[in-house]
């Protein structure tokens, strides 16, 4: 029996439509549109594609989108100065600095320089700490997007044995925190994990984010499991595949995300959600205080 497909494209479009409707309500009430600043340093082709998709999504929902395409020669001090300016800009609710940054610029220093209230990627230590303390504010986009997929498909998670393959700061670690919040018993595996197969075979819910095509053989999947494949890998043939051997896994799993069209669209949709949230929860309040003075 083939698994049911978790269609990230459809759910992402639903999310964007919902945000667009809320933006129209804001405008009708005399409020400003949310604003997102997207900063790209250098000319990494993959980064340019990601940034273009984010800018397009902003325009689709009616956000104010500001683009800052900086040359590869940009210094760390120049980038931090731009972030300072955006932190103090009352029309900007979210600041996104596209990673990776060129050599010589400290990723951590740059991300920590973004004000937590404008950290719509959810990478600032304050926002990660809030998630860890079970009181999340702006949440990392890919993990939150995955949770949204599970919720929209009414897939129950309480009591499941969840396994996350990959322990990156962007996906694996925050994903484990999201799964704990969702009531799962959660295991995180990484490059030092012994007997990975045993962990995967015991997973009721499997999230794989390692960036290696077909890293998890389909035969390892527990029958009926929920499989979330975060990987996006382009083969020499040009075909895009995930981190899980899809053709075999789809015959064993109960639910599975395809690649492409699964998790990827949700990352951008969640960025849009986070920007609206930052606008309404943080900056509307501050603007009202200023008007009341």
UniProtKB/Swiss-Prot annotation:
CC per GO annotation: cytosol
Residue ranges of coiled coil: none
Protein task: Catalyzes the oxidation of 5,10-methylenetetrahydrofolate to 5,10-methenyltetrahydrofolate and then the hydrolysis of 5,10-methenyltetrahydrofolate to 10-formyltetrahydrofolate.
Database matches in Pfam families: THF_DHG_CYH, THF_DHG_CYH_C
Family: Belongs to the tetrahydrofolate dehydrogenase/cyclohydrolase family.
Protein's pathway: One-carbon metabolism; tetrahydrofolate interconversion
EC number in record: 1.5.1.5, 3.5.4.9
InterPro entries: Aminoacid_DH-like_N_sf, NAD(P)-bd_dom_sf, THF_DH/CycHdrlase, THF_DH/CycHdrlase_cat_dom, THF_DH/CycHdrlase_CS, THF_DH/CycHdrlase_NAD-bd_dom
Catalytic activity as recorded in UniProt: (6R)-5,10-methylene-5,6,7,8-tetrahydrofolate + NADP(+) = (6R)-5,10-methenyltetrahydrofolate + NADPH; (6R)-5,10-methenyltetrahydrofolate + H2O = (6R)-10-formyltetrahydrofolate + H(+)
Keyword annotations from UniProtKB, A to Z: Amino-acid biosynthesis, Histidine biosynthesis, Hydrolase, Methionine biosynthesis, Multifunctional enzyme, NADP, One-carbon metabolism, Oxidoreductase, Purine biosynthesis
Family annotation (Gene3D superfamilies): Leucine Dehydrogenase, chain A, domain 1 (3.40.50.10860), NAD(P)-binding Rossmann-like Domain (3.40.50.720)
Protein name: Bifunctional protein FolD
Biological process, per Gene Ontology: L-histidine biosynthetic process; methionine biosynthetic process; purine nucleotide biosynthetic process; tetrahydrofolate interconversion
């Amino acid at each position: 029996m083939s698994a049911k497909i978790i269609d990230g494209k459809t759910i992402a479009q639903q999310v964007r439509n919902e945000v667009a409707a809320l933006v129209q309500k804001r405008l009708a009430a005399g409020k400003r549109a949310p604003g997102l600043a997207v900063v790209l340093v250098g000319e990494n082709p993959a980064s340019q594609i990601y940034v273009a998709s984010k800018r397009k999504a902003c325009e689709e929902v009616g956000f104010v989108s500001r683009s800052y395409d900086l040359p590869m020669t940009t210094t760390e001090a120049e980038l931090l100065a731009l972030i300072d300016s955006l932190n103090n800009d009352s029309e900007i609710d979210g600041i996104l600095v596209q990673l990776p940054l060129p050599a010589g610029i400290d990723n951590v220093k740059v991300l920590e320089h973004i004000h937590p209230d404008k950290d719509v990627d959810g990478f600032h230590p304050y926002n990660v700490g809030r998630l860890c303390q079970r009181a999340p504010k702006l949440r990392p986009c890919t993990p939150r997007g995955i949770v949204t997929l599970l919720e929209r498909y009414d897939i129950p998670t309480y009591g499941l044995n969840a396994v996350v393959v990959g322990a990156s700061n962007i996906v694996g670690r925050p994903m484990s925190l999201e799964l704990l919040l969702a009531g799962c018993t959660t295991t995180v595996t990484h490059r030092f994990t012994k007997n990975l197969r045993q962990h995967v075979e015991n997973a009721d819910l499997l999230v794989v984010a390692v960036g290696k095509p077909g890293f998890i053989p389909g035969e390892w999947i527990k029958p009926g499991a929920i499989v979330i494949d975060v990987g996006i890998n382009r083969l020499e043939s040009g075909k895009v595949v995930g981190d899980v051997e899809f053709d075999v896994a789809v015959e064993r799993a109960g639910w599975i995300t395809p690649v492409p069209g699964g998790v990827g669209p949700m990352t951008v949709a969640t960025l849009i959600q986070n920007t609206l949230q930052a606008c309404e929860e943080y900056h509307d309040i501050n603007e009202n205080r200023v008007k009341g003075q």
